[in-house]
Regions:
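Membrane-anchoring alpha-helices and their flanking helix-loop junctions
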Residues: 1-193
């Protein structure tokens, strides 16, 4: 009982922090996107708990990320989507699909995500895990959501950001491929990748 209460308190704080950050942007679409992230996580938590499976936990984050980016992109532009918004949204969605697919495939091959052996047995603990995933999506996406809602202009800084994204994305793919082949990336620049 004591642990259950703590799990619910942590979940409440995660939502409070995330939604508060959304409110602080002063942009309704960003706040609503953050709320949407939690709704998606909680809706997908239901079948996950009923079937005691973590197999689509990472896909929940993927679906949430794509949904909130598209929501903000389409709701904050009054039907006029500028090229900068399209580029940033496309890069985020591309990264999200790659990471989500990699994580889902890895868990599918392994048969389970060992982190969830005990977690998925407890309603409050599993709920907290899904809620914290909603927080992770919200906090990681909030800067991009704010930029998209304000309209991203293509400037030199934007192009530098795109180049940095491409380099980081390539390193992440290389690292994931090596990790998938059980090659440890402990030297040179690949040691910094978090795959």
């Amino acid at each position: 009982m004591k642990n259950s209460l703590l799990n619910y308190i942590i979940s409440f704080v995660a939502v409070l922090i995330s939604v508060s950050l959304g409110i602080l942007t002063g942009i309704d679409e960003v706040r609503n996107g953050i709320i949407l992230s939690f709704i998606i996580h909680w809706l997908l938590f239901i079948p996950a708990y009923v079937f005691k499976t973590e197999k689509f936990y990472d896909l929940t984050g993927t679906i949430s990320y794509i949904s909130i980016v598209l929501y903000v992109l389409l709701s904050s532009t009054d039907g006029i989507i500028n090229f900068g918004n399209m580029i940033v949204s496309s890069l985020i969605i591309m990264w999200t699909i790659r990471l989500g697919t990699f994580l889902f495939t890895r868990i599918k091959k392994a048969g389970e995500d060992k982190r969830f052996r005990e977690i998925k047995k407890s309603f409050s603990w599993f709920f907290m895990a899904f809620t914290i995933s909603g927080m992770w999506v919200s906090i990681c996406a909030i800067c991009a959501l704010t930029g998209i809602s304000n309209g991203i202009e293509l400037t030199g800084v934007t192009y530098i950001g795109i180049v940095i994204f491409i380099i980081g994305f390539a390193l992440e793919i290389i690292s994931s491929t090596l990790l998938d082949k059980s090659i440890v990336c402990s030297s040179a620049i690949l040691s910094f990748s978090s795959a």
